[in-house]
């Protein structure tokens, strides 16, 4: 079955409430966005990034939950968010919701 929509949960500040979100075919957590996802009672399908800002306890929980983890080198040309967005776009998903990363500066999302 082709996936129609995705949620990308970025790390950083997040003012989103669970009841503001719908149902998603794919939930992608970006590095420390995994912690945000779990706080919203969401189980990610995929964690993506260099995992430099996610604690070991959260990684162990994700492994127990059998979440797929795509770990990248810290020294890379793309941000973790860019890698997550590319992954979702490669799945040909057009309906994408992005939460988190509310630092106030959009340039923090892209390198």
Feature locations, PLM:
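N-terminal beta-strand-loop-alpha-helix module at the start
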Residues: 1-62
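Structured beta->alpha junctions
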Residues: 13, 51, 73-76, 102
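Alpha-helix C-cap/termination motif
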Residues: 40, 65, 90-91
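Glycine/charged-rich beta-loop-alpha catalytic/anionic-binding loops adjacent to active sites
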Residues: 63-72, 96
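Short phosphate-binding loop-to-helix
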Residues: 69-91
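N-terminal glycine-rich phosphate/adenylate-binding segment common to multiple enzyme folds
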Residues: 94-103
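Short Gly/Thr/Asp-enriched flexible loops that form oxyanion-binding sites at enzyme active sites
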Residues: 106-111
């Amino acid at each position: 079955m082709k996936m129609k929509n995705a949620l990308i949960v970025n790390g950083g500040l997040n003012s989103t409430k669970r009841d503001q979100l719908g149902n998603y075919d794919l939930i992608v957590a970006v590095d420390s966005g995994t912690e945000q996802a779990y706080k919203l009672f969401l189980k990610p399908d995929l964690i993506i990034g260099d995992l430099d800002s996610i604690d070991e306890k959260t990684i162990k929980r994700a492994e127990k939950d059998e979440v797929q983890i795509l770990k990248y080198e810290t020294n890379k040309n793309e941000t973790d968010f860019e890698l997550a967005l590319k992954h979702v776009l490669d799945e040909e998903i057009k309906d994408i919701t992005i939460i988190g990363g509310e630092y106030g500066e959009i340039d923090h999302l892209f390198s």
